[in-house]
Amino acid sequence: MLDRYVFGKVNRVSPEAPVPVFLSEKKKEVLGGAGNVFNNLVSLGVFTTLITVIGSDAIGDEIKKNLKKNKKSNKHIFIEKKKSTSKTRYLVNGQQLIRVDEENKNEIGKQAYSFILKFFKKEITKHDIVVLSDYNKGIFSTKLLNSLIKISNQKKTPIIIDPKNKNFDAYKNSTLITPNLLETSQVTNLNCDTDKEAENCGKIIMKKYKIKNVLITRGEKGLSYINHKNSIHSSTKKIEVFDVSGAGDTVLAIISICFANNIDLKESLNLANKAAGSVVGKIGTSVIKKNELFKDNIKNINKIINIKNL
């Protein structure tokens, strides 16, 4: 996925229709979705292998160009004859005026499906954890997800998934999923606003879908981590928010690193909250840097910097 930002100004209303005239001044293009998770992991020094599918179009070419910037990583990219996904945001004085999306949500073909399975089986033995970023754009069918989860469990490799599919049967038997508040509420048909409600929703998801851990991202209310042993809630600090796009990707990256390194749950959530707070304070999709994450001399800094392969 490609995240595009067009910065400009509006000084007048169009004579053609009652709409503002946007004068473009600057453009920026960065990886979004799974690409943003990948960038966050690489930024923190994690050796990461990316397996993905893009379209044979200009957006796909730009995605490949951005991926080439990360040389200390592996990339397996299948190019399919379909439209790549992009989100173009037009901003005036830091405020989003409109977002224009381009996408094709049709399921990938048999060749792309086989490509993913082939390289997944090849790479999983070289890595300590699997991270799936499911934006529901046609790559992760229930069949493919079930296959990837089954392979991960057979290899005893933890698999962490950021879900967008409303059918959570697709994520059965996964190690950890990270739904947001809305997704959690929709799948359980319950309110999940308070800590107690979030805990109850997490337990329902775990029991119904045989998922070992649930991390609910609750925006300004923080994070709730639920497993069979305990439930931990981590609140956020009040900060000025400029742009929430990509914050969930950053949380996914941090939690994956901490999980792979057996970091204490409470500290893992504090790190994830801190990282998310850092990126929402910037305009546009951005990544967390080591110096931002560890500037307060967190006690596990040495252990976390000795990060594993994802």
Question: Language-model segments: which ranges?
Answer:
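Gly-rich Lys/Arg/Thr-decorated short loops/hinges at beta-loop-alpha junctions or inter-strand turns
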Residues: V13-F22, N93-N106, P179-Q186
